[in-house]
A protein has these predicted regions:
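Beta-strand-turn-beta hairpins that frame and shape the catalytic cleft
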Residues: 56-65, 176-184, 233-237, 266-268
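Active-site neighborhood of phospho(di)ester-bond hydrolases with catalytic His/Asp-centered motifs
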Residues: 67-68, 92-97, 101, 118-123, ...
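Active-site neighborhood of divalent metal-dependent phosphoester bond hydrolases
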Residues: 115-175, 197, 201-215
């Protein structure tokens, strides 16, 4: 009797061994009728993901701070480093988009070094390092792209060649162990650097497949600018860790990041509001000639740009 093709924690095996990809495909074909199609596809994708992703696992840690989208907000970054230290973070991770939206992006880099922040590329770093013409933000609406272009051109002009070259050295993903949980850190999603994972349009079955394909116990992402956490039936977690560059379109001026920790009952996720000198940031933005629409968001907590990408539920919660 032949060995059965099985899937355990997102890792595909043949019998008790991992086998070469060609042999795996032959075995899957022979046993195809014994498995539902979706399980076969998930197994194959998980196996190939393991071959293609040699990312080393960092840690282990008991508690880490994770955030995305600095958007040049050096004032919020300074507050975050102090707050994360007070909360006992053993490491601090940034999921990309160091520049954009805010003023004077060069002020961010020394703070990253000072705080020993471990970063990955977002679409901004990827584009700036490669000298691309746009931010590859993933917007489709002309108004969204209009303001995205203003933001990108400003950031491009105000980042030194050395800073852009350093951005090019950043990885696009990290794997981190928190307690017994192996977490994958990405900017948009494991599939694309600029994929938007909104809470209302990321159903549980889809997230379970992403986790299977990525061979991990949790995915931490950003890019949308809106924080959320979903604990799945499989016991795994997907978190949009929030951004510290601008408010979360909720009428509040604070920004958001996440504390991730190991607990006896599983992975602990705390979405943390962070106050900072938003009046100082608004004044600096005006002195740099950035659009008043950007300044209004900082002062009111409501987005005035990049709204058209929002799904219906998230847009319904908006002021505009």
């Amino acid at each position: 009797m032949s060995s059965k093709l099985t899937v355990h924690r997102g890792l595909a095996t043949w019998g008790e061994k991992l086998v070469p990809l060609a042999a795996f495909r032959q075995a899957a074909a022979r046993e195809g009728l014994a498995l539902p199609r979706e399980e076969r596809e998930s197994a194959m994708l998980a196996y190939t993901a393991g071959l293609d992703d040699p990312t080393p696992v960092e840690g282990p840690y008991s508690r880490i701070a994770v955030f995305g989208g600095i958007y040049s907000n050096h004032l919020a970054l300074l507050e975050l480093l102090e707050d994360a230290a007070r909360r006992g973070a053993e490491a601090v991770y940034c999921l990309g988009d160091l520049g954009a939206f805010g003023p004077n992006p060069e002020k961010v880099r020394p703070l990253l070094a000072q705080g020993q922040v471990l970063a990955i590329q977002g679409n901004y770093e990827e584009s700036l390092a490669a000298g691309r013409e746009d931010c590859n933000c993933g917007y489709t609406d002309p108004r969204d792209n209009h303001f995205a272009e203003i933001s990108y051109r400003y950031t491009e002009r105000n980042c030194s060649p050395e800073f852009k070259a350093w951005m090019g050295t950043l990885p696009q993903r990290r794997r981190v162990r928190v307690g017994e949980h192996e977490l994958l850190l990405v900017h948009g999603s494991p599939r694309r650097i600029n994929e938007f994972l909104f809470h209302s349009t990321a159903p549980v079955p889809f997230l379970e497949v992403l986790l299977d394909q990525s061979r991990c116990d949790g995915i931490l992402a950003t890019h949308t600018g809106l924080h959320w956490h979903r604990h799945l039936p499989s016991g795994r977690d997907v978190v949009n860790v929030g951004v510290i560059g601008r408010p979360a379109n909720d009428g509040q001026t604070h920004v958001w990041y996440s504390m991730i920790e190991a607990r006896e009952e599983g992975l602990g996720v705390e979405l943390v509001p962070l106050a900072y000198d938003h009046l100082g940031l608004a004044a600096e933005m005006r002195s740099e000639g950035l659009p008043e629409e950007f300044v209004e968001t900082v002062l009111t907590g409501w987005w005035t740009t990049c709204l058209e990408i929002l799904p219906a539920r998230e847009r319904a919660a908006s002021r505009f």
